[in-house]
Curated annotation (Swiss-Prot):
It is found in: Cytoplasm. Pfam families: Acetate_kinase (PF00871). It catalyses: butanoate + ATP = butanoyl phosphate + ADP. One of its GO terms (cellular component) is cytoplasm. GO terms for molecular function: acetate kinase activity; ATP binding; butyrate kinase activity. This is Probable butyrate kinase. It comes from the Bacteria. One of its GO terms (biological process) is acetate metabolic process. Gene3D superfamilies: 3.30.420.40.
Amino acid sequence: MGFQILTINPGSTSTKVAWFDDDKLVWKDSVEHDAVTLSQFPSIAAQFELRASEVEKAVEKHGSDLNTLDAVVGRGGLLRPISSGVYSVNETMLKELIDARYGEHASNLGAPIAHAIASKVGCPAFIVDPVVVDEMDDISRLSGWPELPRKSIFHALNQKAVARRVARDFFSVPYEQLNLIVAHLGGGISIGAHKKGRVVDVNNALGGEGPMSPERAGTLPIMKLADYLYEHKPDRKEFSKKLVGKGGWVAHLGTNSGKDLEERVKNGDEHAILILKATGYQISKWIAQMAVALAGEVDGIIITGGLAYIPELVDFIQERVLWIAPVFVVPGEDEMLALAEGALRVLRGQEEAKTY
């Protein structure tokens, strides 16, 4: 029997739980939380006991024994900017997450729940590559306004995980020896330049930068945006929603569904075809930008995330970027496996857990 690892990923209305034997999935579950029940809590942090209890019930339901665990891993929440890696859960981290010092999000409960369970059974608790991973070069942080530096917020967990797998399975070398461009294509789209294990440049997928995506507007013409603000004077919440949530495909087509778009394209919907091509075009341009960040020394380009299941989109992108480097398509995202793989590297002595 290998190392026994429990992974926990809290979302807005559910908590995903999975049990691994080394990197082999034993079982997984998604505990749904009633929206009305959750709305009665004054904060996300106040949901801790409810969600922790539900995680333990899921373990019991699947017949696993918490006392056999070698590690518990929670999804990393909103912390200060940190370098990539596996972090031991400590009191400083717990306090900042519970207090929502850097923002409130359901993922803030990942580390506290992992720590609570790990403390009961005497094993370590970790987080792996949270969205706040920041390894950008200083030169890539600058914008044309000193008051508005660029920030690193991206799909770090999935980008790092698929980059490691491609390095292992196709190059037979450690991830830290390669220069890769990883394009995570989901509800949000982030494209990162991975230079010998560090993401030295990446678009801020949550901050209005990059290609348009199913739900996000991406980079916009700035003077036109200023005109819109002066003319319409939207409130902050409404405006933020137009950028993240109701932008991109939602604004153009009224849908955020890749399957819906794919169906409309197959049925010959010319506007849907145009939006798919425009999305692919913008993604391709950002991939090319990241080749510049790597000075043209690119070993491979990885296309991952849920939209990588759309062949028309992937083919469009490949036609435009194959001149840069070979393209590897790794559809979907497996955050639970990525969490387990991080813990496994520490348990096997391949990596040392960092202190927050």
